[in-house]
Regions:
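Mobile genetic element proteins and their domesticated derivatives, centered on retroelements
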Residues: 21-24, 31, 51, 67, ...
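An active-site-proximal beta-strand-loop segment
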Residues: 119-158, 164-165
């Protein structure tokens, strides 16, 4: 009825009110009620501005639950129902989309490795279980590949690299980065799919030298690495899909990915972490970030 009243207000200078009410199937009492409501001062004006600001500052990816937690952190208590209504009125909509997954499986080239993780993505402390995978981005300037490693403890991106080719150097450089940041005496399980990158000598040698434990999904079984693929899905929904990448160079696009992951680790609210980001969660528990 509110939308109808707005349209009728816009047209009543040209057409008679009774005709408009009849055309929009709206009772006169309902119309005058909506007018009175719209003419009242907006008691949520400051909250409306705050919600819009939070939404825009966080890449337009926060739904009403994360907005609720972000407001709570700023000392503002507002019901989720009111937040949902304000977001609808302000047209603050999170865009979602899905694309096909990049696959690097080229057949068996080394002996089969046990699936130690076995879809148990829970970890009691940082660097206990790490998940890794590669995903592909295609923009007008070309293709870029992201290799990332996710910590099951809190979803933190423990390491990542980007490159124009999904080769051994891409994943090995990322693994070197993670190994360099491991706490002393830490030997996590590293779980991957059966992509060729994770069965080449360079990867296996690095794993063995660092005392890391290999775990691999079954062939063609996406749920076995669902937590890592889930991160890629969030990244693409929140950063990639729904935007125009015309005239964006691969270097600039690479920087966009870096900025997103830094924001994801340090700022992005996770509902499963009580409204904290992965870095904030570690600091809250007394772990090194």
């Amino acid at each position: 009825n509110r939308e109808k009243a707005v349209i009728i207000d816009a047209l009543k200078g040209k057409y008679a009110l009774p005709m408009l009410l009849s055309r929009f199937n709206m009772a006169k009492s309902s119309y005058y009620y909506q007018q009175a409501v719209m003419n009242k001062p907006d008691k949520y004006l400051s909250c409306r501005e705050q919600i819009t600001s939070i939404f825009q500052e966080n890449r337009g990816v926060y739904g009403y639950r994360r907005i609720y937690l972000a407001l709570k952190r700023e000392g503002v208590i507002l019901s989720e129902k009111i937040i949902r209504r304000i977001m609808k009125e302000e047209e603050l909509t999170v865009l979602l989309s899905k694309k096909r997954k990049y696959s690097s499986y080229l057949g068996e080239i080394t002996p089969e490795v046990e699936n130690i993780v076995s879809r148990d993505f829970h970890a009691d402390q940082p660097y206990e279980k790490l998940l890794t995978d590669i995903t592909e981005f295609a923009i007008p300037s070309g293709k870029l590949y992201l290799s990332a490693m996710i910590d099951c403890f809190d979803g933190k991106v423990a390491g990542w690299t980007t490159g124009t080719r999904p080769n051994a150097d891409l994943v090995n450089t990322m693994l070197d980065q993670v190994i360099a940041n491991l706490p002393e005496g830490c030997h996590p399980v590293v779980h991957s799919d059966r992509g060729c990158h994770y069965r080449w000598p360079g990867w296996i040698d690095r794993m063995n030298e660092a005392g890391l434990i290999r775990s691999m999904s079954k062939k063609g079984c996406s749920p076995d690495n669902a937590a890592c693929e889930g991160f890629f899905g969030r990244l693409k929904n929140e950063m990639f899909y729904g935007r125009s990448w015309e005239k964006v160079s691969l270097d600039d696009f690479r920087q966009e990915i870096d900025r997103y992951i830094i924001w994801y680790n340090h700022k992005r609210i996770k509902l499963s972490l009580g409204g904290l980001s992965p870095i904030e969660y570690r600091q809250h528990l007394g772990f090194a970030a």
